[in-house]
């Protein structure tokens, strides 16, 4: 899958990101259990989707590999606000994006700056940096 890399399940920590069922998620809980005398430890990983806020989980041996999304944090300038959508321009590449305004984001105004993330082809505004 493009935009991801593989890591061992045993090296994951709370607060990191992981792909669960093809959805990039932030890890909120990890529990490791050793089943007995024979057999490897298993990890139960619980995550919340970055973009949909859906709770997902999986169980896997700690020695197995799992996909981790490559998260790219960028800055953009607000060009226009159109109802529940906002048009922003990336300050490095100058590409224009139309993104939904997430809940809890206040203070958006044309000319202001925002921070947004990009992961596996999806975008989300994370915070307002400043105004004009």
UniProtKB/Swiss-Prot annotation:
GO molecular function: ribosome binding; RNA binding; translation elongation factor activity; translation initiation factor activity
Keyword field contains 4Fe-4S: no
Major site of localization recorded for this protein: cytoplasm
Disulfide pairings: none
Cellular component annotations (GO), alphabetically ordered: cytoplasm
Protein location: Cytoplasm
Hypusine: residues bearing it: 37
Keyword Cytoplasm: yes
Taxonomy, superkingdom: Archaea
BP GO annotations: positive regulation of translational elongation; positive regulation of translational termination; translational elongation
Matching Pfam families: eIF-5a, IF5A-like_N
Keywords from the named record: Cytoplasm, Hypusine, Initiation factor, Protein biosynthesis
PANTHER family (alphabetical): TRANSLATION INITIATION FACTOR 5A FAMILY MEMBER
Purpose: Functions by promoting the formation of the first peptide bond.
Family: Belongs to the eIF-5A family.
Name of the protein in its database record: Translation initiation factor 5A
Origin species: Methanocaldococcus jannaschii (strain ATCC 43067 / DSM 2661 / JAL-1 / JCM 10045 / NBRC 100440)
């Amino acid at each position: 899958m493009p935009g991801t890399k593989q890591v061992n399940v045993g090296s994951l920590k709370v607060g990191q990101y992981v792909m669960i069922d093809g959805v990039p998620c932030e890890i909120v809980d990890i529990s490791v259990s050793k089943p007995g005398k024979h057999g490897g430890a298993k990890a139960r990983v619980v995550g919340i989707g970055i973009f949909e806020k859906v709770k997902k989980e999986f169980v896997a041996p700690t020695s197995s590999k799992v996909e981790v999304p490559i998260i790219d944090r960028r800055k953009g300038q607000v060009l226009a606000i159109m109802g529940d959508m906002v048009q922003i321009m990336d300050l490095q590449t100058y590409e224009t994006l139309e993104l939904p305004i997430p809940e809890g984001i206040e203070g958006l105004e044309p000319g202001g700056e925002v921070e947004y993330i990009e992961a596996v082809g999806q975008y989300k505004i994370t915070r307002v940096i400043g105004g004009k």
